[in-house]
Design a protein with these regions (language model features):
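Regulatory inter-domain linker segments that are low-complexity and enriched
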Residues: 1-7, 11, 20, 55-59, ...
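Short, exposed beta-strand/loop patches in secreted or surface proteins that constitute
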Residues: 14-16
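Forkhead-associated
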Residues: 18-92
Length: 115
């Protein structure tokens, strides 16, 4: 399961379960996630989850800026469209989020082959 976690001062304030498809973020009421912030455009960004053709129950994730006024940031860099990796920081206006994939094995213990 993909989770979008709202981060405040390094701690998780809330999380949203995501599913396949487009997830819009912006100030307007019609967005999947509405952010009440003057630095956020009406339709600011879209996170897209597409089922991976080779790995069952995993998704390819991308984030697209929708020509917002103040930009969409991933790991402090502005992006127009980018493939997203597990745990990267997304900043929209004053809001910070991280996407987590329960199926991702990033950061798990290293396994060594027998010698």
């Amino acid at each position: 399961m993909i989770k979008l976690k709202h981060i405040i001062n390094g701690a998780v304030a809330s999380e949203i379960d995501m599913s396949e498809g487009d997830f819009s973020i912006g100030r307007d009421h019609g967005n999947s996630l509405q952010l009440d912030d003057g630095a956020v455009s009406g339709k600011h960004a879209v996170i897209s989850l597409v089922a991976n053709a080779y790995l069952p129950e995993t998704f390819d994730i991308s984030i697209s800026d929708m020509d917002s006024t103040n930009g969409t940031y991933v790991n402090s860099f502005t992006v127009s469209q980018q493939h997203h990796k597990h745990g990267e920081v997304i900043r929209i206006g004053t809001y910070e989020y991280k996407l987590y994939d329960d199926q991702s094995h990033v950061g798990t213990q290293t396994e060594y082959l027998p010698q």
